[in-house]
Amino acid sequence: FKEGNTVLLNIISKSGSTNETVMNSKVLLKELQKLTNDWAQYVVVTTQPGSKLEDWAQEYDISILPNPKNVGGRYSVFCPVGIFPLALAGIDILKLHKGASKMLVKCFDEDVENNPALQSATAVYRAMQREIPMHNMFLFDQDLERVGKWFRQLTAESLGKDGKGITPLVSIGSTDLHSMVQLYLSGSKNIFTTFVNVKNTGDINIPSIDSQFDEIVPELEKMSVDSVMDAIYKGTKESYENRELPYVEVILDKISEEEIGAFLQFKMVETMLLANLMDINAFDQPNVEEYKKATRRLLN
C-alpha cells in the first residue's frame, strides 16, 4: 500500500460471526486504518444477508457481496465467496462456470455409462458396503493440492453424521509415494482411492549433466519429465492392481479453469448422490456449532 500498490481486504464469513475470521479481520483492519482514512473503500464483505457482519459493513458503506443462505460453505465455490477472490487473482470465472455447467448436464444423465458422478458414487458406496470407510484422493499434480483439501472438507462435512461417514484422505503424487504408499499397499485394506492425473502439464526434457551423473539413473537418459511421471503413475496403479486394491481413475486433459470447474461440479454431485445412498442430509453440518459454542464460552 505504501509503495503505491492497491490493497483489497475481502472479509468472508457466511454466518458473519466466525471466530477466526473476525479475529484476523480486526488485526488487518487496524493496520489498514493506520494507512488511510478512506480504509472502508478497500474492504469488501462477503456474508449472508442479515448477519452482524453485513450490519457492520452497511454502517461504513462497505461493499457487500451476498452469499446465499441456502448454500453451505463447501458448496459455495461458484458463489461470490469463491469466484470473487478467483476473479481478483486473474482466473477466468466464466470458463470455470462453463466447465461446471457442462459437467452438470452429464451428471443429470440417467444412463450410468454417461454419468461420471453416478459411476463414482456407486463405486465408493460399494466400497463402504465392503467395510472400506476411507476415501483417498491421490492427486498426481502438486497444483491440485488445494482441490484435494476442498474435497476433504466436502466429504467430511457432508457425509460425516448420524454415526455414518467416509474418512477423506488427500495424497499428492509423487510426494506421498515416499511417505504414505507403504501403508496404502501393505496396511489394512480399508481405503478406496480416486486417482487424479493430468494429461498435459507442459513437458520438460531432462538434460544431460555429465557421464558420471547420468549413470546414477541411466533410465532417465533422453527422457522427459512427463514421461517419467507417467511411468511413476502407471507403476503406482499397477501396484494397486497387483494387490487388488479398489480405485477409480479421473484424467484431466489439463489444468485449466474449464477442467477444474467440471471436476469441482462432478465431486459435489457425487457427494450428494452418496448422501442419498447413505440416507443422510448432504447439506447441513449440525455438530460444527458445538466447538464454536464451547470456544465462545471459554473466551468469556
Regions found by a protein language model. Give the residues of each.
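Short, solvent-exposed amphipathic alpha-helical segments in soluble enzyme
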Residues: 1-3, 26-28, 59-61, 151-159, ...
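Acidic catalytic cores of enzymes that act on phosphate-bearing nucleotides/polynucleotides
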Residues: 91-95, 105-236
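Short helix-terminating capping/connector loops at secondary-structure junctions
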Residues: 2-5, 36-40, 130-131, 162-163, ...
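Glycine-rich phosphate-binding loops that contact phosphosugars or nucleotide phosphates
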Residues: 1-110, 293
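Conserved, well-structured ligand/cofactor-binding cores
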Residues: 1-5, 9-25, 50, 78, ...
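C-terminal amphipathic alpha-helical interaction region
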Residues: 278-300
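Short beta-alpha connecting loops at secondary-structure transitions
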Residues: 63-70, 217-221, 279-280
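Hydrophobic/aromatic beta-strand patches that form the interior of the parallel beta-sheet core
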Residues: 10, 44-46, 63-65, 138, ...
